[in-house]
């Protein structure tokens, strides 16, 4: 029904509104609308972080120095053979530290002798299985041990040698004349420490051994009876038959003596990261008020992670220029280095070469032996170890331990996270007893440091292959300086196969953390494959893929206390279900690549973050965790809708559902500039959202990130 009043009102209202606008009573002017402009997302950049200092010592399981034999034939004019840093040989990972190092032992086994073919060794080492091995290690062999510090498990040091055949060649050039023992001094260990006492001062005692240079007319009468030209024609060493001046054959100790032979007494201040100590000889002749001990060196070193580096100061130097000492310990050393072994740093090994290249020293020391009743022995300062099942002598205040490094390997689809060895050097990957440098030799900072992205001119990630060299016939010729290992079949246990490691490592902006992909490739030789096999069969590869992460943890005292700190980085991931569908992604600094972002509240001990897959908008995983000391633990989960494993499948997209993956990680660098972590989810069907198309879900992930600061 048509209502004229309504029609009239409908016509008047627009006119009224229009007149109101024209009259200034209202406005549609956009300039006067009070709206807040959208704020741009904050822009971040990596914080500056101090680069690791170049390490002269790259670490390792152990090192050995071979005895020298001088060509004393006059016309050869070889009046002196000094020791050199390049003479150090890496021992490799020992099967059992009490045994002789395999590489060096294989060299001495081939040494010819004039009479007996025995290998003589330190009496506490496992006898050699060589013919008549260890025969004669009785009264004439030094007894070398520190009282109450004798039961070593992780580190051994010592000497072994043969009475080498006399060489006298005057018929064929080059003419030569050599005589004397041929062998090694060494230390080696297993299970480099991942945790150490957080504080407190701990005493370590043990033994040390030396080998000298050779020089015409040189005698060391104070330590060795030179009846066979020790120090002149061949190296004098602590296991020599002529070492008659220590108390090696005494049945009881004299007051003031710390043990038998050459012993060490060290103290580690774990709070201040300092090692100090002394190397002494326990003297044989203490009659006529002679000193019961003679100190030859004092040690001082800085502890970094599970390694230490410093100096050895000779304490019995000549007092005047005209004075001479009839022992080789007259020069300081700037090359003291070593490391801690055992789950809690129970034992340590060390080495150094004197600056005058006259003497090399190796040693091993441990915390106090546990009493026979099994109770933990008292630590330095008289306080008992508080940690249950703690190692003897490694108790600190309240028995607290601190993690100094992470090194893990996660095999794709495996439930277990395996621990890797590491020598507090994130840029050295240690697998199968072999050390793999993760940075190119041309790196601006050396093998143990990272280039700084574009500043260093390196890619964000690096891919390379590493094939260990075959065992050399002569271990001395085949071993490089500073622990670069060269053995493959022996040390790496490849059982005659050629093993190649394919490595992808991230990231160029991380100095104290490295993570990535590792592929082991084993290919048999034609002989290994069998005479009837073809060359193609011989080259068949066995491929095993995994991820790794390793980092140098921040000192707990240096963990920040700020809130809302942003870290950004990347990640490697492998996500799968049991329906043969999987997704994998590698680390990248591309805007659309695998991204990791975390917010850390150090004050509240909380960490939250996301891992986002390449070319995805929604987070693949969200992570929530709690910070403890210099690390964190938490959980990772996918969104309730799951993670699409194959986006190209538009009909029935297979998904992965993960709700409770256990995450572990840590903070790395001097000031926690870097963080990283890992998780391996085993593949349980754990959520009601999982469908038959999805099956059981599994995931393997490693991630890393750098602390950010706003761009100014």
Curated annotation (Swiss-Prot):
Which residues are covalently lipidated (N-palmitoyl cysteine)? 21
List the residue ranges of the region (C-terminal beta barrel domain): 556-712
Q: Where is this region: N-terminal beta barrel domain?
A: 197-367
Gene Ontology terms, cellular component aspect?
cell outer membrane; cell surface
Keyword Signal included in the entry's annotation:
yes
Q: From start to end residue, where is composition biased (Basic and acidic residues)?
A: 95-104, 462-475
Bias category Polar residues: which stretches? 128-144, 477-495, 689-700
Q: How does it sit in the membrane?
A: Lipid-anchor
Which residue(s) hold a covalent lipid per the annotation (S-diacylglycerol cysteine)?
Answer: 21
Bias (Low complexity): 372-398, 446-459
Matching InterPro entries, A to Z? OMP/PagP_b-brl, TbpB_B_D, TbpB_C-lobe, TbpB_C-lobe_sf, TbpB_N-lobe, TbpB_N-lobe_sf
Q: Where is this region: N-terminal handle domain?
A: 59-196
UniProt miscellaneous comment: N.meningitidis cells will only bind to human TF, not bovine or porcine TF, explaining at least in part the bacteria's inability to cause infection in non-human hosts.
What interactions and quaternary structure are annotated? Binds only human holo-transferrin (TF), via the TF C-terminus. Forms a large complex with TF and TbpA. Interacts via its C-terminal domain with Slam1.
Name the family the entry cites: Belongs to the TbpB family. Isotype II subfamily.
Free-text domain note: Has 2 lobes, each of which has an 8-strand beta barrel flanked on their N-terminus by a 4-strand handle domain. Electron microscopy suggests that in the TbpA-TbpB-TF complex, TF is captured directly above the loop domain of TbpA in a chamber of about 1000 Angstroms(3) formed by the 3 proteins, where interactions between the proteins serve to abstract iron 2 from TF.
Protein's job: Neisseria acquires iron by extracting it from serum transferrin (TF) in its human host. Acts as a TF receptor and is required for TF utilization. Involved in the initial capture of TF. Helps select only those TF molecules that can be used as an iron source and concentrates them on the cell surface, maintaining the iron-loaded status of the TF C-terminal lobe until its delivery to TbpA.
Protein name from the UniProt record: Transferrin-binding protein B
Source species of the chain: Neisseria meningitidis serogroup B (strain ATCC BAA-335 / MC58)
């Amino acid at each position: 029904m048509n209502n004229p009043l309504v029609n009239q009102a409908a016509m008047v209202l627009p006119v009224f509104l229009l007149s109101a606008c024209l009259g200034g009573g209202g406005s549609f002017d956009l300039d006067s609308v009070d709206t807040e402009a959208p704020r741009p997302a904050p822009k971040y950049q990596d914080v500056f972080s101090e680069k690791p200092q170049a390490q002269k010592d790259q670490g390792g399981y152990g090192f050995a120095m071979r005895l020298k034999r001088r060509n004393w034939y006059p016309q050869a004019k070889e009046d002196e053979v000094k020791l050199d840093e390049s003479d150090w040989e890496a021992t490799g990972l020992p099967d059992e530290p009490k045994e002789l190092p395999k590489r060096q032992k294989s060299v001495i086994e081939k040494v010819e002798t004039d009479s007996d073919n025995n290998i003589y060794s330190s009496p506490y080492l496992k006898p050699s299985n060589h013919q008549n091995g260890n025969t004669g290690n009785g009264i004439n062999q030094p007894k070398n041990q520190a009282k109450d510090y004798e039961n070593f498990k992780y580190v051994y040091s010592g000497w072994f040698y043969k009475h080498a055949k006399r060489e006298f060649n005057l018929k064929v050039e080059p003419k030569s004349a050599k005589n004397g023992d041929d062998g090694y001094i060494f230390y080696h260990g297993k299970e480099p420490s991942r945790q150490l006492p957080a504080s407190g001062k701990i005493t370590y005692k043990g033994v040390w051994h030396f080998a000298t240079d050779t020089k015409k007319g040189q005698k060391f009468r104070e330590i060795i009876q030179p009846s066979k030209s020790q120090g002149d024609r061949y190296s004098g060493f602590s296991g020599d038959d002529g070492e008659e001046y220590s108390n090696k054959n005494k049945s009881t100790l004299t007051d003031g003596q710390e043990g038998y032979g050459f012993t060490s007494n060290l103290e580690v201040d774990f709070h201040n990261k300092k090692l100090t100590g002394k190397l002494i000889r326990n003297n044989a002749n203490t009659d006529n008020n002679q000193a019961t001990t003679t100190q030859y060196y004092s040690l001082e070193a800085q502890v970094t992670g599970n390694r230490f580096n410093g100096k050895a100061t000779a304490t019995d130097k000549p007092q005047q220029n005209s004075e001479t000492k009839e022992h080789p310990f007259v020069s300081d050393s700037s090359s003291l280095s070593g490391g801690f072994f055992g789950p809690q740093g129970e034992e340590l090994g060390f080495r150094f070469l004197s600056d005058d290249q006259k003497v090399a020293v190796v040693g091993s020391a441990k915390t106090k032996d546990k009493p026979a009743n099994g109770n933990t022995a008292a630590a330095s300062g008289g306080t008992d170890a508080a940690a249950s099942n703690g190692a003897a002598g490694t108790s600190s205040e309240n028995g607290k331990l601190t993690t100094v490094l992470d090194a893990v390997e996660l095999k794709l689809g495996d439930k277990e996270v395996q621990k890797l060895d590491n020598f507090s050097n994130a840029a050295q990957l240690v697998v199968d007893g072999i050390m793999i440098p993760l940075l190119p030799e041309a790196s601006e900072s050396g093998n143990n440091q990272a280039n700084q992205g574009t500043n260093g001119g390196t890619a964000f990630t690096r891919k390379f292959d590493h094939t260990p060299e075959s065992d050399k016939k002569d271990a001395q010729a085949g071993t490089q300086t500073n622990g670069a290992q060269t053995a493959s079949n022996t040390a790496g246990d490849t059982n005659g196969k050629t093993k190649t490691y394919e490595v992808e490592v991230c990231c160029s902006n991380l100095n104290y953390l490295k993570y990535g992909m590792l592929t082991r490739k084993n290919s048999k030789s034609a002989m290994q494959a069998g005479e009837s096999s073809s060359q193609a069969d011989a080259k068949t590869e066995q491929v095993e893929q995994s991820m790794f992460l390793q980092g140098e943890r921040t000192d707990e005292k240096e963990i920040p206390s700020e809130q809302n700190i942003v870290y950004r980085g990347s990640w490697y991931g492998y996500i799968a279900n049991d329906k043969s569908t999987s997704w994998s992604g590698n680390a990248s600094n591309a805007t659309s690549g695998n991204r990791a972002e975390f917010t850390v509240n150090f004050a509240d001990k909380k960490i939250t973050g996301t891992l986002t897959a390449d070319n995805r908008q929604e987070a693949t995983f969200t992570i929530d965790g709690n910070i403890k000391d210099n690390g964190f633990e938490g959980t990772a989960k996918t969104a309730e809708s799951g993670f699409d494993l194959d986006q190209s499948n538009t009909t029935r997209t297979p998904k992965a559902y993960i709700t409770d993956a256990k995450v572990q990680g840590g903070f790395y660098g001097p000031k926690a500039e870097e963080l990283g972590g890992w998780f391996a989810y085993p593949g349980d069907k754990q959520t009601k959202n999982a469908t038959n198309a999805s099956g059981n879900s599994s995931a393997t992930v490693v991630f890393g990130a750098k602390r950010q600061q706003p761009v100014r």
